[in-house]
Amino acid sequence: MTDLPAAELPEPVLPEASSLAADRPEAELTEPELTDALTEAEMIANGVTVLVLNGPNLGRLGSREPEIYGQATLADVAAACAATGEQLGLTVDVRQTDDEAELVGWVHEAADERLPVVLNPAAFTHYSYALHDALAMRTAPLVEVHLSNPATREAFRHTSVVASVADGTVAGFGLHSYELALRAVATLLAEPPPAAGP
């Protein structure tokens, strides 16, 4: 890397800041506008950690019903998530468990540390009220994700106890479901927080 004299260093450009300042100088930007631009820049620079949590039987991907779930393994999911996270400036922590209590513990960790979550609850989707209640305490974006489209499968899979506490659901795109979910998380992180009530 070539060292440039301080006078020749380019000015850093914050994401969205240039559009905010298009019609007026920086001194006239309101504090919320500056905060929003800095929040997005800090997210990219600091690599916000996203937990990508996977429920029961997802450790068997690649060998379990490949006609439904595809040939990709959990290692492939982790690699795709890491690559997408790198593109988005996010650090991705991919985990899998067959144990409901462990999954709930990870959700508590995310809430305590204000970490966004991409969650494939697998079979817990349909009946785990413990998971639902843990997710209701979330403090950061949450996107539910599924490799297959549950709505096209058995009737018992049509119910999700997770959907009502998630920001949204991505389903039916195989491995790409995770990539799309991470992009949704990045978008949610970049949005300004909702205005306080009256």
Regions found by a protein language model. Give the residues of each.
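Long, low-complexity intrinsically disordered regions
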Residues: 1-44
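Short, acidic/small-residue loops that bind anionic groups at enzyme active sites
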Residues: 137-153
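Glycine- and acidic-residue-enriched helix-capping/strand-helix junction motifs
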Residues: 61-75
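Short acidic/histidine-rich motifs immediately flanking catalytic phosphotransfer sites
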Residues: 110-117
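Short beta->alpha junction loops
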Residues: 91-101
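Short Gly/Thr/Asp-enriched flexible loops that form oxyanion-binding sites at enzyme active sites
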Residues: 128-137
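Short glycine-rich anion-binding loops that position phosphate/pyrophosphate groups of nucleotides
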Residues: 56-58, 122-125, 148-150
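Short, glycine-/small-residue-rich phosphate/pyrophosphate-handling segment
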Residues: 152-198
